Every structure is written in structure tokens, then in C-alpha cells.
């Protein structure tokens, strides 16, 4: 799999919502992996930017909001279940992304509905056709 040059939108950097704490956050491992293989990362988190900048500096892009992170993205990674990520406008999500691919790391979305709407959808512990 060649990730070089691919852009990943990341929603959520902290290990849980309503905190700025990134200790043990899965985002650290995932983003480091993506960067190691030449991917670009554009992330949004309501409270995690200060700690994220200490970890990655300018190696990733910090989006102004969740939709800004999606612009031109090849894939959306939902890594923290912040309230503002619960009910996005999926028409807008699809319109902004280069490829409508979602990995839901929190099993927050209805995968069958997203697949019916034309998304490629993956989550933890479930398979979809």
C-alpha cells in the first residue's frame, strides 16, 4: 500500500473527548505511521492542538474546523468521539473529500447508511459488504 502523498483528515487527537490530554491517544501511533510512509495529515481537535504541536510541530496541518480538515482528503479518520463529530453533514463531507472513504475508529456512524450514500466505510470489529 502506497501512502506517499495521500492526505488523511483526522478528527480527534486527544484520547477522549472534553480534554486536551493526548497521553496514550491512538492518534499518536496512527499519525506517526502515516507520516513515516509519506502521507499528509490535516487534523482537527477542539482542545488538543497545543499538545499536538509539541508532538508534531509543523509536520501536520492544523485545520480551522472539522470541515476544513476534509478539503481534498483521500480518507477521513475519526479517532475521538467529540460531540461535534457525531452528526456531520455527510453531503458536505463527501463534497469536500477527494475520495469518500471513512475509517470510524469509534464505531460512531451507521456504516450501512454511509455505504448506501456512496462512502467506503470501515470501523473497528465489523465487516461491511
Regions flagged by a language model, labelled:
Residues 1-129:
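Structural/interface elements that position substrates and couple domains in central-metabolism enzymes
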